[in-house]
């Protein structure tokens, strides 16, 4: 126990791990002189896992390993298995074409490196980029010995945990292939981060029972606004397969803009407590890897009936937002609807249209006026966000390039054009409107919150920024520093505790103004990166504390229910709230300009669109006539605050987990790509300094690596923390944070996925 001025906390050391939350570990199999073992990829497991004789190969049923709960000791009849290689006819690069998920008929099997029985595969395991449940198990005639597993990647179940002087033991559940084979890195990440990647039979059954189209006389349409006559479009990336959102903008007669944001009504098909719902909650989010994805929902829904595909009817939850010519929100309406997307647009195509590219303009001539209105409104909304202090870090993100065979060919900066900003602004506006409505009604909901930064993080950033001549322009609270008295004397260096008096007075404006000052400067990249690191992570919570980075008093996630479980929860709550109000809700925020005699819920929008019905009046009329009212908004459900609290914790953890898996796979692919560049020189930015050396980021490839002091052979270098520099004792040559230098790649550490550089002379 440690205490300081009445503040106490418990500290200790982990002595022995008696059991792990996850019993499976992925690693590389090694044949040793005394025993066979697996070296885990998870660096938190620093020991080998011994694989006893007879446990080297999976128990197999129809080509799949048994689940861990069913795996027993190896049967005597199961002999060691030889692993098929490329020379034996198994081609890991081959991708068998799959059918469209809406086309009847069986799915062809898809395999990478495994001999899998076609009859055991569901569509979910081989369409849409999901893991196929690989198991490289060959027929009995080709079984040989455990040496065929040497250097292969396997997934093992821990059967005996480590004890003093005794290594843990385990058995092989799956053989994934060789590390360098196509797709094996994704399989490793899926298992390392324990991402659910096979839909259980009850989930498959529910997904298969989902309708493929919406009947014209579907009772669900009676209480929905009909938007099928409007040229509504989706705008997504070129490789997107699921479309959550569709948009449309029109100019009203009095000069205001009317923004339509239509979001897939996933709650209509994924009901609370169903097998689909339980699996979606378990996954929490879709996980996107560079070459494929692990979806939250089966493809019959995510790419089928829920996806806002072009030229087909789809159920939606709609947000209609009216903005005045200054971009102020004056009124909004939330309601269920039905749309028929006119076109599946890409960011690139919209960019070309806005730039006046002839081919794009000719192809989409009928939609050009609408895209021009979208551009106008998005610029107004961006300016309004900037005026209130919203922070926008335009940091480059890497994008992996592949050839037609799936081989990685390069790393480039992902393009971010104004078409991305259009969708971003429209989704932000819809999310804020939904959050504002639910909070205004006092309805418990799930918010997307971003708290103020921690004072220590801000102080650390201020100290670094000062070396560049910059500051956030804030007044730091006074600090008290005291040395901790430790009972455990094994700590070599004294440790201190700092306490700050008073609250840190900081606002998004401080960050925004500094970001604007840095724009175009040499130090922009490094200081923007450090500013971002000083902020807390956004998360989900039932308690609304606002969103610091967006400078928004209330915010939620509503616009991506196909790939995020919190959005699905918000849809259910919103539908339950709207059902109490007769099916829709209209809110006036500010008194705008122009004709205010009619609300947006009573206007006819667009040629060919019928005047919207009044669902309350229709329901009352049906009741008066003795007709039983139709069910109101299927999938609607309020959620208890205690359950919302649990959901906030679960979904925030799922999001972090997915981000870690995506980030680590990107590092794996970068290291694999750089293997062919050992000895090459690169321009680099110094992004971090420690006593042992400095970290660099390659300017053109967005690849990070380390330059150890031992590789600086021209002098004896010392790290000066106060100066944020590494300086040669004799030459006085300095390497400072944010400076650019030229480096040479000298070594790749595959086991830890690290790159080592030296300074190029």
Predicted regions and their residues:
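Arg/Gly-rich low-complexity intrinsically disordered repeat tracts
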Residues: 100, 110, 128, 589-603, ...
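Append "with occasional cross-activation on large, charged helical scaffolds in nucleic-acid assemblies
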Residues: 334, 347-589, 616, 631-702, ...
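Short acidic-glycine loop/turn motifs at beta-strand connectors
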Residues: 32, 252-253, 323-328, 402-405
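Covalent nucleotidyltransferase
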Residues: 293-352, 373, 545, 550-553
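Charge-lined substrate channels and their catalytic hotspots, especially those that engage the 3′ end
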Residues: 1-100, 108, 115-260, 267-312, ...
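Short helix/loop capping segments that flank catalytic or ligand/cofactor-binding pockets
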Residues: 47-49, 165-167, 180-184, 243-245, ...
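A generic structural signal for residues embedded in beta-strands
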Residues: 1-2, 156, 689, 743-745
């Amino acid at each position: 126990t440690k205490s300081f001025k009445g503040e106490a906390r418990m500290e200790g050391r982990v002595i022995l791990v008696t059991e792990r939350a996850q019993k499976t570990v992925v690693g590389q199999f090694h044949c040793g002189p005394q025993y066979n073992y697996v070296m885990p990829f998870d660096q938190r497991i620093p020991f080998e896992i011994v694989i006893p004789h007879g446990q080297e190969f999976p128990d197999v049923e129809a080509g799949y390993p048994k689940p861990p709960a069913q795996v027993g000791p190896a049967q005597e009849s199961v002999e060691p298995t030889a692993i098929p290689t490329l020379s034996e006819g198994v081609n890991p690069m081959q991708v068998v074409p799959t059918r469209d998920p809406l086309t009847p008929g069986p799915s062809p099997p898809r395999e990478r490196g495994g001999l899998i029985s076609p009859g055991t595969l569901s569509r979910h395991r081989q369409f849409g980029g999901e893991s196929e449940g690989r198991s490289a198990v060959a027929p009995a005639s080709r079984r040989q010995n455990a040496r065929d597993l040497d250097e292969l990647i396997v997934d093992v179940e821990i059967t005996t945990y480590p004890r003093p002087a005794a290594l843990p033991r385990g058995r092989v559940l799956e053989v994934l292939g060789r590390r360098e084979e196509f797709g094996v890195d994704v399989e490793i990440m899926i298992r390392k981060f324990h991402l659910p990647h096979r839909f259980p039979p009850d989930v498959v059954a529910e997904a298969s029972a989902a309708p493929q189209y919406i009947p014209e006389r579907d009772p669900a349409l009676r209480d929905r606004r009909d938007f099928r006559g409007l040229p509504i479009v989706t705008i997504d990336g070129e490789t997107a397969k699921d479309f959550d959102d569709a948009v449309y903008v029109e100019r009203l007669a009095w000069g205001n803009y009317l923004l339509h944001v239509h979001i897939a009504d996933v709650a209509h098909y994924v009901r609370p407590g169903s097998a689909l719902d339980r699996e979606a909650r378990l996954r929490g989010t879709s996980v996107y890897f560079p070459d494929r994805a692990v979806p939250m929902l089966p493809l019959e829904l995510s790419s089928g009936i829920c996806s806002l595909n072009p030229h087909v009817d789809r159920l939606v939850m709609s947000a209609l937002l009216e903005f005045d010519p200054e971009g102020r929100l004056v009124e909004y309406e939330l309601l269920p609807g039905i749309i028929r997307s006119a076109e599946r647009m890409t960011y690139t195509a919209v960019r070309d249209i806005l730039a006046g590219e002839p081919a794009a303009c000719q192809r989409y001539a009928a939609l050009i006026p609408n895209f021009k209105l979208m551009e106008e409104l998005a610029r107004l909304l961006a300016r309004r966000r900037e005026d209130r202090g919203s922070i926008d870090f335009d940091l480059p993100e890497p994008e992996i390039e592949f050839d037609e065979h799936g081989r990685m060919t390069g790393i480039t900066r992902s393009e971010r054009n104004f078409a991305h900003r259009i969708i971003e602004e429209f989704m932000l506006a819809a999310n804020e409107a939904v959050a504002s409505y639910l909070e205004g009604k006092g309805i418990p909901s799930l918010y997307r919150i971003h708290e103020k930064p921690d004072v220590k993080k801000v102080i650390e950033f201020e100290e670094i920024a000062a070396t560049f001549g910059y500051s956030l322009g804030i007044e730091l609270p006074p600090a008290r520093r005291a040395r901790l008295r430790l009972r455990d004397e094994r700590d070599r260096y004294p440790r201190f505790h700092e306490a700050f008096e008073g609250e840190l007075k900081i606002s998004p404006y401080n960050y925004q103004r500094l970001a604007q000052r840095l724009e175009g400067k040499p130090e922009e990249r490094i200081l923007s990166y450090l500013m971002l690191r000083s902020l807390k992570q956004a998360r989900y919570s039932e308690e609304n504390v606002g969103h610091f980075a967006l400078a928004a008093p209330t915010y939620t996630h509503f616009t991506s229910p196909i790939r995020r479980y919190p959005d699905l929860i918000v849809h259910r709550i919103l539908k339950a709230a709207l059902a109490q109000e007769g099916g829709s809700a209209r809110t006036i925020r500010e008194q705008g300009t122009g004709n205010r005699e009619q609300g947006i819920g009573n206007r006819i929008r667009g040629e060919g669109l019928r005047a919207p019905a009044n669902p309350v009046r229709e329901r009352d009329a049906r009741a008066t006539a003795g007709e039983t009212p139709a069910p109101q908004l299927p999938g609607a459900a309020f959620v208890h605050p205690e359950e919302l609290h649990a959901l906030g914790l679960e979904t925030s953890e799922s999001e972090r987990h997915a981000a870690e898996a995506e980030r680590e796979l990107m590092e794996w692919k970068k290291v694999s790509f750089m293997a062919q560049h050992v000895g090459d020189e690169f321009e680099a930015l110094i992004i971090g300094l420690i006593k042992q050396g400095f970290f660099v980021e390659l300017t053109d490839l967005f690849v990070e690596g380390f330059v150890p002091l031992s590789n600086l052979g021209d002098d004896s270098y010392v790290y000066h923390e106060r100066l944020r520099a590494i300086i040669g004792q004799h030459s006085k040559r300095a390497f400072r944070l944010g400076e650019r230098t030229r480096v040479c790649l000298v070594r790749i550490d595959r086991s830890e996925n690290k790159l080592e550089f030296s300074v190029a002379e």
